[in-house]
Design a protein with these regions (language model features):
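C-terminal His-loop and adjacent cap/lid subdomain of alpha/beta-hydrolase
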Residues: 1-429
């Protein structure tokens, strides 16, 4: 397979490359973060060139330090911004480096896309607002694809020193952590700051999950740190909310005693990652616009909503969460077929809202019959009340999948996979 001219620069999350997991994971068989297992082979079959930047193992770490005015030893922070910039610039445009090492991709790259997930999505926004996406007046990344990082930046404030590369985030146990949810928060304000530097902002796609709104304050990426009205997204940005999706998928893992109360989320959101990457690349290479923004409607989180509250240092911030239907499923957004014809409630919060539970969210299956749900005091309609039989269910899944394909949110191969999975459901006859 010849390369398609696109370089995907994978910014690893806490040392773990993300690209194979996000884009090559088969349905219900997650390629782990950090793995170079090709999984479905989607990226390779499409001709993408993937480069991940990470530490070379076995050499130890000698971190540069300096002494501040008070004589305290401080660590030099933010060096990864320059590293990512220089590696991407070398691979995308240089013939050799400064000591004559040949660029293996010389002449093969026409566009460069940065990939970020959660922490490294926040890293990429910080990368942009600090002006690193320009080299000698040239724009470096023409595209940026970010999952799960609508609000906030990389944390270089709360933990100075060796551990800041991993960094902490605000949690339900520690909501006042500084350095992450800092202005500019709204995506429009992030891009405005890039423009103020005299730089041309890249074309960007942001993908959010339901969990991001409950556990990571994603609504601030739409409103900023004040008020509840969405700020208009710039024309070079698309934002897609995946209804019912969790921030992380933990297939095969069962919450243990004293851990999460509910089973982990199971909604497979990888098909949306694949389709939106194709849409972004098409936008860059042919100027064909991606599908319009698809956002979930929000309302202010009540005190008992199991949502991460606004920090005290943002007194005007209003945390908003997706509006749910009578089944507990989020309304609006990009609705995968498993949300259009659900077998349960996807993306619910998962007590006790520890780090893993709050990001893995939950799945709660519907009862099979009316008698079973009434015995369990479950107000949600049972499967037998929702669907005539398995054929009815499968037809609804297929119709929803074809609709998403027509709108640009599913690839043809994923339509077939989703439809086949529906036909194998055993809880309906």
């Amino acid at each position: 397979m010849r390369g398609n001219g696109a370089l995907l620069l994978d910014v690893p999350n806490r040392g773990r490359p993300i690209s194979q997991s996000l884009f090559n994971s088969p349905r219900n068989v997650l390629v782990p973060l950090g793995s170079f297992d090709q999984g479905t082979g989607f990226l390779q079959d499409a001709g993408y060139t993937v480069a991940a930047v990470s530490w070379e193992l076995g050499h130890g770490v000698e971190l540069p330090t300096f002494k501040d005015a008070e004589g305290t030893t401080r660590y030099i922070e933010g060096t990864a911004f320059a590293i990512i910039r220089d590696v991407a610039d070398f691979l995308s445009s240089a013939s050799t480096d400064t000591v004559g090492t040949r660029n293996p991709l010389a002449g093969a790259i026409s566009r460069t896309v940065a990939l970020g997930y959660s922490q490294t999505g926040r890293f990429l926004k910080s990368f942009l607002v600090r002006g690193y996406n320009s080299v000698e007046g040239r724009r470096l990344f023409s595209g940026v694809h970010i999952l799960g990082a609508a609000s906030g930046h990389i944390n270089l404030r709360s933990i100075p020193g060796p551990e800041s590369g991993a960094g902490t985030i605000p949690t339900f146990d520690n909501p006042e952590v500084r350095g992450v949810n800092e202005e500019p928060l709204a995506i429009s304000d992030v891009l405005e700051q890039v423009n103020s530097l005299g730089q041309i902002a890249p074309r960007m796609i942001f993908v959010n999950t339901t969990t991001d709104y409950f556990s990571l304050r994603a609504s601030l990426g739409r409103t900023g740190g004040s008020g509840s009205e969405d700020k208009p997204l710039p024309p070079n940005v698309r934002m897609y909310d995946i209804a019912g999706a969790s921030h992380v998928l933990l297939p095969g893992m069962v919450p243990g005693t004293g851990q999460c109360k509910l089973p982990y989320a199971i909604l497979d959101w990888h098909p949306i990652m694949r389709s939106t990457l194709i849409a972004l690349d098409r936008w860059l290479s042919t100027n064909i616009s991606p599908p319009p923004n698809e956002l979930m409607p929000l309302w202010e989180a009540a005190a008992d909503a199991m949502a991460l509250r606004a920090p005290n240092y943002l007194p005007k911030a209003i945390i908003q969460i997706p509006i749910r239907d009578q089944d507990g499923n989020a309304n609006g957004g990009v609705r995968l077929p498993d949300m259009v014809a659900p077998l349960g409630t996807h993306g619910g919060q998962n007590p006790p809202l520890s780090f893993t539970c709050s990001l893995g969210s939950s799945y709660s299956a519907f009862a099979k019959t009316k008698e079973e749900r009434e015995a369990a005091n479950d107000s949600r309609l049972s499967l037998m009340e929702r669907y005539k039989d398995r054929s009815d269910y499968v037809n609804r899944i297929r119709t929803a999948a074809r609709d998403l394909e027509q709108r640009g949110f599913l690839l043809t191969e994923d339509v077939a996979i989703i439809s086949h999975a529906a036909a194998e459901v055993t809880t309906l006859k």
